[in-house]
Amino acid sequence: MDIERGIRVAVDTGKVILGSNKAIQAIKLGNGELAIMAENTPKNVKADIEAYSKLSEMPVYTFEGSSVELGSICGKPFTVSVLIIQEPGDSNILEIKE
């Protein structure tokens, strides 16, 4: 499965949350099916995401690329360190959590 294509299709056709602060809030509330983190996510944010996702039983996938690359894949002109897939849309991105 092409992860990058899956992320892009999910951003275009589904419902996603971009950004670490909003992502942490969504994980705390259990709003989402999958968390995707960039490889260079700051350690404190990474620790928070992993801890809260364990509590809410949300799978976390570490994207093998930087936040700049993740932002570019999402079609955004800024860095994206964390995104939450709430609804995948036409994407098959949720297959990576298995």
Curated annotation (Swiss-Prot):
It comes from the Archaea. Transmembrane segments: none annotated. The keyword Ribonucleoprotein applies. GO terms for cellular component: cytosolic large ribosomal subunit. InterPro entries: Ribosomal_eL30, Ribosomal_eL30-like, Ribosomal_eL30-like_sf, Ribosomal_eL30_CS, Ribosomal_eL8/eL30/eS12/Gad45. GO terms for molecular function: RNA binding; structural constituent of ribosome. The keyword Ribosomal protein applies. Keywords: Ribonucleoprotein, Ribosomal protein. One of its GO terms (biological process) is translation. Belongs to the eukaryotic ribosomal protein eL30 family. This is Large ribosomal subunit protein eL30. It comes from Methanosphaera stadtmanae (strain ATCC 43021 / DSM 3091 / JCM 11832 / MCB-3). The lineage of its organism: Archaea, Methanobacteriati, Methanobacteriota, Methanomada group, Methanobacteria.
